[in-house]
């Protein structure tokens, strides 16, 4: 009896031990190729940033992609075929990863694979359970078995980062919990830690992007700086010491230096990408810097071909709600926590969007200056046609949001919970809202003409 009891206690202790195994392997060969954007067609290019927001964001962004797939330009081509880049966070990362794995024609399968499944009921959510107190003390109510493993088995079927289609480029964003800097599953980050990006499971990347603090335990990444055969790229030191570089770029560069400091760091603990930037646009600024060129991450040939670059931020932000603004006493405890969580995500996201607007303007200026510095011979070798106008390129930034819709639709979509699962009728409404927002957007309409 005593032996049986001890055995049960031992098993319980083992069962309660958190799984903190790193998701990555050391770099086996040469560093990852540069994170370049490959454009197609005649130089009219679309990029998308898909925000976080759980199943609300995943569903709304799915509607956006479906409508782009079903919208044709003046030549009969699909607008979605112009999409060269998708950067995404949390709920938006599920949709982006699915799109990168299955392409435009496989988008409809996301509902059965993920959105229509009741994942929420499988999670540990109650604060009343002593077992959950222990889980919380270990770093989060839910571990990899409730996030990475579920995504791998139910959604992505064992796919790895190498299995994503080359185009569009999919950028999945998390947050380095130690530095607070963005961490993207892209070549510059994995070169900095001397790790094999291609071997990372797609589910682990998405899980890192979705790992909301407290609700989910951080995803662990190992740094391999001690064994690294190459130095940090020159742009890292330049960005870290620059007085004019965007703050998030400087912090990202500083985090890269931490990755190589074995006295300071052996493991990176990744949490929800929305903690640093719920739009995922900050990583694009890093990719720009890491390219080492005025036009990067566009290739030189694509930068010459480029005519119009339209960047859509898809914002599935929840509406502010509650009756406490009518009360002199203000919010109660739970309402205060909910409001603080919303502010903590929305404030840095809005700051990142404003900073990115300035970066888009600079990107356009840099591309024009570089193009106009080319000799006619060099421009021709890169594919420039006769009578090519080096300054004829237009960069545009727009935000797709619930506020673009009717008041009724805005209210319905904005009250959807931030949860990993939602009722099917709510998903229907969110997908329809994403479609409607694209169908009536002026920048999208301009792309059809």
What do the PLM-derived regions correspond to, one by one?
Residues 1-14:
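Sec-dependent bacterial lipoprotein signal peptides
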Residues 13-449:
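Catalytic domains of lipid- and phosphate-ester/thioester hydrolases
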């Amino acid at each position: 009896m005593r032996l049986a009891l001890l055995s049960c206690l031992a098993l319980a202790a083992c069962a309660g031990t958190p799984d903190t195994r790193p998701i990555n392997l050391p770099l086996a060969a040469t560093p990852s190729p540069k994170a370049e954007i490959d454009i197609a067609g005649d130089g009219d290019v679309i990029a998308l940033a898909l925000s976080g927001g759980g199943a609300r964001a995943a569903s709304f962004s799915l509607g956006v992609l479906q409508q782009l797939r079903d919208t044709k330009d003046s030549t009969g081509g699909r607008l979605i075929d112009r999409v060269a880049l998708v950067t995404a966070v949390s709920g938006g990362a599920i949709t982006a990863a699915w799109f990168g794995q299955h392409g435009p024609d496989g988008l409809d399968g996301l509902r059965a694979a993920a959105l229509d499944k009741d994942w929420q009921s499988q999670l540990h959510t109650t604060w009343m359970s002593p077992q959950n107190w222990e889980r919380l003390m270990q770093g989060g109510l839910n571990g990899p078995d409730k996030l990475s493993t579920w995504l791998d088995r139910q959604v992505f079927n064992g796919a790895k980062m190498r299995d994503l289609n080359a185009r569009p480029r999919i950028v999945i964003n998390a947050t380095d919990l130690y530095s607070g800097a963005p961490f993207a599953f892209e070549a510059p980050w994995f070169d900095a830690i001397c790790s094999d990006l291609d071997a990372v499971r797609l589910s682990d990347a998405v899980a890192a992007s979705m790992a909301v603090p407290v609700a989910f335990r951080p995803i662990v990444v190992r740094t391999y700086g001690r064994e690294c055969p190459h130095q940090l790229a020159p742009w890292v030191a330049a960005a870290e010491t620059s007085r004019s570089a965007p703050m998030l770029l400087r912090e990202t560069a500083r985090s890269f230096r931490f990755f190589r400091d074995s006295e300071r760091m052996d493991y990176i603990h990744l949490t929800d990408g929305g903690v640093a930037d719920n739009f995922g646009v900050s990583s694009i600024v890093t990719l720009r810097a890491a390219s080492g060129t005025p036009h990067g991450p566009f290739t030189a040939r694509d930068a010459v071909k480029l005519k119009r670059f339209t960047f859509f931020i898809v914002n599935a932000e929840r509406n502010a709600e509650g009756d406490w603004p009518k009360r002199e006493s203000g919010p109660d405890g739970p309402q205060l926590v909910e409001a603080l969580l919303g502010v903590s995500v929305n404030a840095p996201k809005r700051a990142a969007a404003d900073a990115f607007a300035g970066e888009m303007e600079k990107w356009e200026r840099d591309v024009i200056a570089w193009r106009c510095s080319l000799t006619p011979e060099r421009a021709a070798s890169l594919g420039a046609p006769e009578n090519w106008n080096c300054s004829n390129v237009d960069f545009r930034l727009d935000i797709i949001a619930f506020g673009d819709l009717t008041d009724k639709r805005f209210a319905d979509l904005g009250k959807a919970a931030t949860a990993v699962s939602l009722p099917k009728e709510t998903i229907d409404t969110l997908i329809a809202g994403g479609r409607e927002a694209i169908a009536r957007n002026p920048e999208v309409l301009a792309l059809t003409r």
